[in-house]
Regions:
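Bacterial N-terminal signal peptides
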Residues: 10-20
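OB-fold/S1-family single-stranded nucleic acid-binding modules
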Residues: 104-128
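Sec/Tat signal peptide C-region and signal peptidase I cleavage site
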Residues: 21-25
Length: 133
């Protein structure tokens, strides 16, 4: 194979990788969540994962029948949360919070977290509040 052909082949492969990987690596709000399923729960934090690409807050929510359901809320990336005043120790297991967001399309106990209210009334924006979709 000639040098020109090798160069063209390499460039084509690199272009496919550069275009294909980012498109597949990230999802959209509309693919997983339903903007017509708003959620607002008061619950107890059981876990907080400050991870990339998105952080997660898990809360136990008491149901009307007395059972407890653990909900998982996807939030912004750590860097976005930090810019909004959030810190690693902002919430800890046992903290009672109010969380608002949108439910998963598949009906699981998963949501896209938009706003968090702490016991002292402090509010944090967790997602893209103005345009969730």
């Amino acid at each position: 194979m000639s040098t020109k052909r090798k160069t063209a082949w390499f460039a084509a492969c690199a272009a496919i990788l550069c275009v294909g990987v980012p498109a597949r690596a990230h999802h959209s709000f509309a693919a997983e969540y339903d903007k017509d399923k708003p959620l607002k729960f008061s619950g107890t934090v059981t876990k907080f994962d400050l991870t990339n690409p998105h952080s997660w807050i898990y809360i136990d929510v008491m149901q009307p029948d007395g059972t407890v359901v653990n909900w998982a809320f996807e939030t912004a990336s750590p860097s976005n949360l930090f810019r909004r005043g959030f810190r690693k120790d902002t919430i800890k297991p046992g903290t009672v919070v109010v969380i608002e967001g949108f439910g998963a399309k598949d009906g699981t106990h998963t949501g896209n977290g938009q706003r968090l209210t702490m016991p002292d009334g402090t509010k944090y924006i967790l997602g893209t509040e103005e345009n969730p979709g």
